[in-house]
Structures are given as structure tokens and as C-alpha cells.
Swiss-Prot record:
PROSITE patterns: HSP90. The TPR repeat-binding motif mediates interaction with TPR repeat-containing proteins. It comes from Danio rerio (Zebrafish). One of its GO terms (biological process) is protein stabilization. This is Heat shock protein HSP 90-alpha 1. Homodimer. Interacts with unc45b and myosin. One of its GO terms (molecular function) is ATP-dependent protein folding chaperone. PANTHER family: HEAT SHOCK PROTEIN 90 FAMILY MEMBER. CDD domains: HATPase_Hsp90-like. Belongs to the heat shock protein 90 family. One of its GO terms (cellular component) is plasma membrane. It is found in: Melanosome; Cytoplasm, Myofibril, Sarcomere, Z line; Cytoplasm, Myofibril, Sarcomere, A band; Cytoplasm, Perinuclear region.
Length: 725
């Protein structure tokens, strides 16, 4: 266009528009509120550029001529320290005049109001892109923004605003940009860090390193260059020339030597000067590893990516790289770390370590809906082709796409663990670190409970120092055995020596040792495995394989000891629900079992140690205790004889209480009044040593109530104790 007409057109065609009210309000909020993470503006502008490039690439699929105006699809960043500007250029689809006016100011996006409400409610500014208003984040760092854009179907236009409630649009008759958009940020004085090479690289690496188009940073730099003095400083040249004239009489004409001198002279007349040049650096050369074919990726590459993703100093233990195609399309790369984080189950910790990308654009890294809590140790990335780029947390919660992604991720994780289980050594390392997660999964994830139960490993009465699976246990079950037997407790030694496993071990029945607190919660949900019920050997109603003769013998013993059971129940009263003859004891005189639906002793211990426990629940879950006596034990047999001879014998009452309290301890319970129990033991020791009560001062210190602890009588009782022993 002729030069003379350019100026009038510029003046005439500058149009001023007012920002739509909600947008003006949003900009005011962005400008006047302090935000610590202002760097997200660059992520949003690069993301917008990537979207524009996606659009032109899509259009070119049906009409290749769309790319004629510019073949290369790219993003460029140009900082200018002198002018304090940062320019973001893309060769995307560009905007028409109407697009400029509508998209950048006069028509509010649906998310504008929602984002302002979220901001005022304390949401992070970094969520701005999820509401479709990411462009306005430019005003976090810029006092004025200029947008130059060219669409294939329109002329080149300039949009400009200093956020004063209005913006201008005018035709641009300057240098053509071909196609695309050029955003020039005139930075605020205190935001000049964003023209520094190091800072720009840092922000791009953090937020946009996996954008699917090359992002090139153009930096003006200086370098030293050797130049001839004729090309350099003329004044020095003249001085040298004057010096040469002065020295001319001394120069001899010696042929070859003259050539050497002239060479030396030429060398001396070189000088280093600084020159400016543009250094172009591609910032996202690392193409997303998850978009590549898994067959082409080495373990070293996976290891490097895992370390950069997780900041872990160790290599990963296992990796799963897969893509899902069809109605839904996404790629995922999942890693199992070598060790569990120390704060894995802390409530304040972010719920997962999987980064969510949408078409290579990072969306968020703590999307709770992406993976269940019990898999929160898995690290990796998920890149969806179907989710919208401007998706919010609220939308994610309702997203059917995300639910399908989640289901696939869980399935693939379980497949990965199953594959890992085939390598015994590596699975042992994995299980040591993450067994709690599997058990938590069994408690929470009913759909995958069967698969998760295959991953469990336990010590058993027959496994020695090796942990075995439930499948191994079932394969070793006796033909007459109907159930899977287990016992819960604090340590392997404690449960192995427990009175509850005596009969089972004698009969050659394998018992699973569950010695982690979370096992109690796990077996509440894992009722059966492979059609076999899991049965606790510490609860009432234990069914053991027995023949008709054994059943008949048991019935006879029940009848024989029925009276003793009644006497013991009367003595213990509310402390116990009932007293029965046991079928599980061999060498112990008695034990305390709990009701089928009540807590085990181990669970009661765990619940008592909870800082925020509910005491009302404690009441009814711990109330039902049953005392089981061993009819084959001499203590019980002798006690029966004495009780039948005189059921009001005070020694019988004292011995029954002592037996009960000792059984509580050996069965894993705690005593409500340990001091009274201790005093009973001390008095037994005194009797054994022949010490008279009058010689002791212990009674003066703590004399229990007479009704709680009947007085034992002198020598006669000593002989009784000998009989019991």
C-alpha cells in the first residue's frame, strides 16, 4: 500500500471497544491482587499457541493449501531486555478481526464468572486456563499487551490494551507475519525477570516441555570476533601507518624476509571486537516419551524420564507403557518406585503422583479422580486426546471420560503387579514397600478385590521364613479342610506361640499369620478366597475337621464340664458372655475368644490406640468375650473337682478370676485393672514361698476390695496351689 495513504487509514480505522463487564472485572482482579506464581502466564500463552497450531493442522488435513502462507508449525519466544518486552509468536490459525473483538474482550467465556468466583473463594491463579480465560493471565506480568494476528481469510490486525477497561483494534500495514499470532508483552518494571534467558527456560521446562510443536527461544548475545584493523578502529590504523612511515628508512629490501615482515605486520593488525548475534535454542527437544513406540525406548530412557518426573535418585522398580484406542484415546506411562515415600499415607499429602496432560498440554498433577488412593505411590503421566483443554476440577469429577481412564489405569496397574509377582526377588522388594497399599485396596476396591487378593503374601505355620500367596495355601489344604484359617497379632513369634493355633498345628492344618494392623481391616472385606471362607482362629464357633468319634467325645466333655462352666460364668459375671468347652486348645488351660462379628484382641488393641477413637463403638464391639476351657488340662480338671466339692470355696473364686485374667493377657487383650491382677500374683508368690500375710507390707500399700479378691487361707491353700500346679 502507498506510504501516503497509510497514515490516514491508520487514524481512521482505529476502533476502540469496551471490555465486557465480567472480563473487565476479571482483569481488575488479576492486576490488583498479589499472586505468587505469576509464571503461569507463559504456560497459558504457549498453550493457546499450541491450540492455534492444532487447528491449522486439522484444517490442512482436508485442505493442504491452508499451509501455503507458512509451512512450518512452530512457536517462538523473543525477549528484548532493552525494550523490556517478551514476544510469543506462533504460526497457528490466526484470528480474523471478528475473532479478535469477540475472543479478546467483548464476549465473556462461560468460565469467566466461574473463575472469578473460584478465585475469590481462594482458588489458585494457575487454574485460569481451565476456565478458558488463560489469555488474560498475560496481565499478571504485563502493563500493556499487543496482539498482531493474521488469518488466511482476513487482513492482518493489531489488538492492543493496557487493561484500562478498553482495547483497540486496527489494521496492520507493517511487516506481514504470514499467518498466525504474535503476542507482545510490555512487562511491568518489577517483572523484568521474564526477559532473562534462564528464567524463560525454567518456566518452559516446568510447564510446557511436552508441547507437540517446537518452542524456540531467540536470545540476542555477544561474542568476540577477530577483525582487521581496517575494518575496525581507523584511528589506530592511522597511528600504525604514521609509525610505519617514521620507521621506513630502517626496512631492508631482502625478498623473502620482506614477505615475512609483511605477514607479521598483517597479524599484528588484527583486533578482537564484540559483535551481536541471535542465538536460537529449541527448548522442548525432548519429545514426549509416552508418544513413542515402547519397543523403541530403552530402559535407560525410561529411567531418565522417571527420575526427571519424580525427582527420585533411584531407578524405578517396574514400568507400564500403554495406549488405549477406540471410542476413547489416551496414552499412559506408569512407574512403580523402588521404595515407598515416608509420608505415603499422610492426609495432607497430595493424593497421587500422576500428571494429567491433554494433547501434550500439562493440565494438573494432583487430580484425585485419576487413580484411587491405594495406588497413590504410582508415578507417571496420562495424556488424553478426548478431554477438553479447559477442563476444571468440578468438570473432572463428573467426567465420564475420566472414569473410563481411571478404570483402565487401575486394570493396567494390577496387570503390572501380577507381572512383577512372577519375578520373586523384585516382588519381594515391591511387597516390603507397598503391601499396605494392596491391603488398603482390598478394603476399598470391591471390583478388584479378587485380583488384589492374588497379590497378597503372608507367613504361615508351614512356610518358615518365606511368605506365600493364598493360592499356595489353598493348594496345600487337606482334603477334609473346608476353610482358610488365619490369626491376627503383633508379631510372627507371638501368633506362632498363641494358644489359638495349638490344635490346628497338632492336626497339621496350616494357619496364616497376619501381623500388620491393616490386615484386620483387610480381612473384614476379604471374606473368602477361591470359594473357601477365611476363618479367624481367635473367634467363637471354630469348625475343625473331625470324625464322628471325635464329635462324640467332644459332646461327652461338654456334658462333663457343664457345671464348671456355669460356676465360672457366675463368678466372672458381666466380665464374660459365656464359658464353653474348647476344641482348639492342647497345652493351654483356657483362652478368650470373641464373637464372630466383634473385634479380635488385636483389633481392640489397634482401636484403643487411635487418638480420635469413638468410645461408643468401643463399648459394643469389645463387649462379647467368651472363655473357653481345655478339658484335658490338669488345672481345669482339678478346678472342676474342687468346684463340684464346694462351689462356694473362696479359693475356687480366686483361681477362676486369676485364670480369666491370665487368659486375657495370653489371648492378646489388656487388663482394665492390672494392679489388682499384679497383687493376686504377688499373693500367690507369697503362698509359694510360705510367707504369712502379716509379714508383708505390700497389703498396706494397696489392699483391693474384699469382694474383688477373696482372702486365701494359709497352709490349706498352699497345698491346694500345689495340686493345681
Amino acid at each position: 500500500m502507498p506510504e501516503k495513504s497509510a497514515q490516514p487509514v491508520m487514524e481512521e480505522e482505529v476502533e476502540t471497544f469496551a471490555f465486557q463487564a465480567e472480563i473487565a472485572q476479571l482483569m481488575s482482579l488479576i492486576i490488583n491482587t498479589f499472586y505468587s506464581n505469576k509464571e503461569i502466564f507463559l504456560r497459558e500463552l504457549i498453550s493457546n499457541s499450541s491450540d492455534a497450531l492444532d487447528k491449522i493442522r486439522y484444517e490442512s488435513l482436508t485442505d493442504p493449501s491452508k499451509l501455503d502462507s507458512c509451512k512450518d508449525l512452530k512457536i517462538e519466544l523473543i525477549p528484548d531486555q532493552k525494550e523490556r518486552t517478551l514476544t510469543i509468536i506462533d504460526t497457528g490459525i490466526g484470528m480474523t478481526k471478528a475473532d479478535l473483538i469477540n475472543n479478546l474482550g467483548t464476549i465473556a467465556k462461560s468460565g469467566t464468572k466461574a473463575f472469578m468466583e473460584a478465585l475469590q473463594a481462594g482458588a489458585d491463579i494457575s487454574m485460569i486456563g481451565q476456565f478458558g480465560v488463560g489469555f488474560y493471565s498475560a496481565y499478571l506480568v504485563a502493563e500493556k499487551v499487543t496482539v498482531i494476528t493474521k488469518h488466511n481469510d482476513d487482513e492482518q490486525y493489531i489488538w492492543e490494551s493496557a487493561a484500562g477497561g478498553s482495547f483497540t483494534v486496527k489494521p496492520d500495514f507493517g511487516e506481514s507475519i504470514g499467518r498466525g499470532t504474535k503476542v507482545i508483552l510490555h512487562l511491568k518494571e518489577d517483572q523484568s525477570e521474564y526477559v532473562e534467558e534462564k528464567r524463560i527456560k525454567e518456566v518452559v521446562k516446568k510447564h510446557s516441555q511436552f508441547i507437540g510443536y517446537p518452542i524456540t527461544l531467540y536470545i540476542e548475545k555477544q561474542r568476540e570476533k577477530e577483525v582487521d584493523l581496517e575494518e575496525g578502529e581507523k584511528q589506530e590504523e592511522e597511528e600504525v601507518a604514521a609509525g610505519e612511515d617514521k620507521d621506513k628508512p630502517k626496512i631492508e629490501d631482502l625478498g623473502a624476509d620482506e614477505d615475512e615482515d609483511s605477514k607479521d605486520g598483517k597479524n599484528k593488525r588484527k583486533k578482537k571486537v564484540k559483535e551481536k548475534y541471535i542465538d536460537a535454542q529449541e527448548l522442548n527437544k525432548t519429545k514426549p516419551i509416552w508418544t513413542r513406540n515402547p519397543d523403541d525406548i530403552t530402559n535407560e530412557e525410561y529411567g531418565e524420564f522417571y527420575k526427571s518426573l519424580s525427582n527420585d535418585w533411584e531407578d524405578h522398580l517396574a514400568v507400564k507403557h500403554f495406549s488405549v484406542e477406540g471410542q476413547l484415546e489416551f496414552r499412559a506411562l506408569l512407574f512403580v518406585p523402588r521404595r515407598a515415600a515416608f509420608d505415603l499415607f499422610e492426609n495432607k499429602k497430595k493424593r497421587n503422583n500422576i500428571k494429567l496432560y491433554v494433547r501434550r498440554v500439562f493440565i494438573m498433577d494432583n487430580c484425585e479422580e485419576l487413580i484411587p488412593e491405594y495406588l497413590n505411590f504410582i508415578k507417571g503421566v496420562v495424556d488424553s486426546e478426548d478431554l477438553p483443554l479447559n477442563i476444571s476440577r468440578e468438570m473432572l469429577q463428573q467426567s465420564k471420560i475420566l472414569k473410563v481412564i481411571r478404570k483402565n489405569l487401575v486394570k493396567k496397574c494390577l496387570d503390572l503387579f501380577t507381572e512383577l509377582a512372577e519375578d520373586k526377588d523384585n516382588y519381594k522388594k515391591y511387597y516390603e514397600q507397598f503391601s499396605k497399599n494392596i491391603k488398603l485396596g482390598i478394603h476399598e476396591d470391591s471390583q478388584n478385590r479378587k485380583k488384589l487378593s492374588d497379590l497378597l503374601r503372608y507367613y504361615t505355620s508351614a512356610s518358615g521364613d518365606e511368605m506365600v500367596s493364598l493360592k499356595d495355601y489353598v493348594s496345600r489344604m487337606k482334603d477334609t479342610q473346608k476353610h482358610i484359617y488365619y490369626i491376627t497379632g503383633e508379631t510372627k513369634d507371638q501368633v506362632a506361640n498363641s494358644a489359638f493355633v495349638e490344635r490346628l498345628r497338632k492336626a497339621g492344618l496350616e494357619v496364616i499369620y497376619m501381623i500388620e494392623p491393616i490386615d484386620e481391616y483387610c480381612v473384614q472385606q476379604l471374606k473368602e478366597y477361591d470359594g473357601k471362607n477365611l476363618v479367624s482362629v481367635t473367634k467363637e464357633g471354630l469348625e475343625l475337621p473331625e470324625d464322628e468319634e471325635e464329635k462324640k467325645k467332644q459332646d461327652e466333655l461338654k456334658a462333663k464340664y457343664e457345671n464348671l462352666c456355669k460356676i465360672m460364668k457366675d463368678i466372672l459375671d458381666k466380665k464374660i458372655e459365656k464359658v464353653t468347652v474348647s476344641n482348639r486348645l492342647v497345652s493351654s488351660p483356657c483362652c478368650i475368644v470373641t464373637s464372630t462379628y466383634g473385634w479380635t484382641a488385636n483389633m481392640e488393641r489397634i482401636m484403643k490406640s487411635q487418638a480420635l477413637r469413638d468410645n461408643s463403638t468401643m463399648g459394643y464391639m469389645t463387649a462379647k468375650k467368651h472363655l473357653e476351657i481345655n478339658p484335658a488340662h490338669p488345672i481345669v480338671e482339678t478346678l472342676r473337682e474342687k468346684a463340684e466339692a464346694d462351689k462356694n470355696d473362696k479359693a475356687v473364686k480366686d483361681l477362676v478370676i486369676l485364670l480369666f485374667e491370665t487368659a486375657l493377657l495370653s489371648s492378646g487383650f489388656t487388663l482394665d485393672d492390672p494392679q489388682t491382677h499384679a497383687n493376686r500374683i504377688y499373693r500367690m508368690i507369697k503362698l509359694g514361698l510360705g510367707i504369712d500375710d502379716d509379714d508383708s507390707v505390700v497389703e498396706e500399700i494397696s489392699q483391693p476390695a474384699e469382694e474383688d479378691m477373696p482372702v486365701l487361707e494359709g497352709d490349706d491353700d498352699t497345698s491346694r496351689m500345689e495340686e493345681v500346679d
